[in-house]
Amino acid sequence: MYHDLIRSELNEAADTLANFLKDDSNIDAIQRAAILLADSFKAGGKVLSCGNGGSHCDAMHFAEELTGRYRENRPGYPAIAISDVSHLSCVSNDFGYDYVFSRYVEAVDREGDVLLGISTSGNSGNIIKAIEAARAKGMKVITLTGKDGGKMAGSADIEIRVPHFGYADRIQEIHIKVIHILIQLIEKEMVKA
């Protein structure tokens, strides 16, 4: 009954991944991001991750697999997803939703830490403000974006962009794969002397 729709969805996902893989700069950006994160951890730094909606879930997934585990047992790595409901509701109420991530960055981060901002459109005002706060603290910034990068284009030390202009779920599918690869590479970097 739905076989054609299922095949169509899976083929579109495969095409989106194939298009992403065609650009070697994407592979290079993933490698550079993993090394940047591992170097921060080795120097006593941490990563804060943030996003909205499905990207918020990706930010939490990223932090959880760093502090918990990915495929193998190993020490936890310092990662925090900005997801504390009391913080989010307080700042939303008192300052506005655009400040929910930047206030946390201002309070918790320091030079040497890394911010991972995830936005399929690249236009999330609260992530843009978090990037600005991170820059003011002397932090490094990695972004996972889509389409043309939106307003976040060019704002990060490393941008990993999925150049897909259709529905956001296709971009999110690549983002979660990138997140898993980042963790795998971080684990390899962390065991190096």
Swiss-Prot record:
Main location, first listed in the record: cytoplasm
**Pfam families the UniProt entry points to:** SIS_2
* Catalysed reactions, semicolon-separated: 2 D-sedoheptulose 7-phosphate = D-glycero-alpha-D-manno-heptose 7-phosphate + D-glycero-beta-D-manno-heptose 7-phosphate
- In terms of domain of life, where is this protein from? Bacteria
Q: Name one GO molecular function term.
A: D-sedoheptulose 7-phosphate isomerase activity
User: Which residues hold Zn(2+)?
Assistant: 61, 65, 172, 180
List the transmembrane segments.
Answer: none
Which terms does the UniProt entry file under GO BP? D-glycero-D-manno-heptose 7-phosphate biosynthetic process; lipopolysaccharide core region biosynthetic process
* Cofactors named for this entry: Zn(2+)
Q: Bound how, and how many: what does the cofactor note say?
A: Binds 1 zinc ion per subunit.
Q: Which family does it belong to?
A: Belongs to the SIS family. GmhA subfamily.
Job description of the protein: Catalyzes the isomerization of sedoheptulose 7-phosphate in D-glycero-D-manno-heptose 7-phosphate.
The misc remark on file is: The reaction produces a racemic mixture of D-glycero-alpha-D-manno-heptose 7-phosphate and D-glycero-beta-D-manno-heptose 7-phosphate.
- The protein's name: Phosphoheptose isomerase
| Encoding gene (name) | gmhA
